[in-house]
């Protein structure tokens, strides 16, 4: 009998075990689609980014013009740029929903998978930040200036560190050149980390909505979930194309249509929408170092999730107290996102401070307490 190549070839065997014969819980919902959607986002971003890089010039005197040239003179350059810029937004929508799913269903108890995932989020944020600087518009320049300046809050080495990152005494040509190099490199780092993420995931297998072991009831990934994933791809790519074609500048900042000018500060410096919640937390503390620490903590707190899990149940499916807290946390992050886009004046300052306080309180204090209470109520 001839060997089945798919199951015996050294390379095809890896693909087979990851995408075809992978034993998968029979009851995972649409919330489990976002991992594969993130993979599609990454591929889309690398392809469109590569095409854009072919027409881009990483020089302060030419960057803005080269982007305008891409949009005006390159065949479908406008479409490639719009897909790339809005693709970043979809990437973040998917990753935030993916993390929300992980929090709700207790997926963070796969500790290695979760920790690699948080590192992936940090790498994605770094990639998006350096990419936003490349068109060299007003918000690109001032965003780069403000955010890199935060490192100067680090005691003793801060100022040296910032000047080392800038390659000079202000954001200038060396900064743009190195940001382009980093923006080209980091997506491939993300691709590598994604493989590590999947390797750890396939050690334990997927979690499921009930949060109980599903070894007794697994089904093959293909055709069941491959078809389900293709539906997700179609819906997401249709949404991305619709946004890129009908309203490409909806999520961008009009300030970025003005070339960078170090002598004129925009009235409101703010990052893209996907960083606004962290930006609001940064601004809510009236101290530079304190703000920077809070900003870092807002993401790094995710590393603590496995340690803060006190419930005897994995998922929140049967835990109403934790469910209420979870949805309050979601609302809270949306409020922070809104506050981050507003000017620094009352009542936005106090709302931002209260929202920042409740963000950390819910995660660090109320979630663990709710878990203990639910155990007691159920006599677990």
UniProtKB/Swiss-Prot annotation:
Transmembrane regions: 34-54, 78-99, 114-134, 179-199, 227-247, 289-309, 321-341, 348-368
Gene Ontology biological-process annotations: mitochondrial electron transport, ubiquinol to cytochrome c
SUPFAM superfamilies: a domain/subunit of cytochrome bc1 complex (Ubiquinol-cytochrome c reductase), Transmembrane di-heme cytochromes
Membrane topology: Multi-pass membrane protein
GO molecular function: metal ion binding; ubiquinol-cytochrome-c reductase activity
Alphabetized UniProt keyword annotations: Electron transport, Heme, Iron, Membrane, Metal-binding, Mitochondrion, Mitochondrion inner membrane, Respiratory chain, Transmembrane, Transmembrane helix, Transport, Ubiquinone
Keyword Transport (UniProt): yes
Subunit structure: The cytochrome bc1 complex contains 11 subunits: 3 respiratory subunits (MT-CYB, CYC1 and UQCRFS1), 2 core proteins (UQCRC1 and UQCRC2) and 6 low-molecular weight proteins (UQCRH/QCR6, UQCRB/QCR7, UQCRQ/QCR8, UQCR10/QCR9, UQCR11/QCR10 and a cleavage product of UQCRFS1). This cytochrome bc1 complex then forms a dimer.
Note: Heme 1 (or BL or b562) is low-potential and absorbs at about 562 nm, and heme 2 (or BH or b566) is high-potential and absorbs at about 566 nm.
Protein name: Cytochrome b
Organism lineage string: Eukaryota, Metazoa, Chordata, Craniata, Vertebrata
Name of the gene this protein is made from: MT-CYB
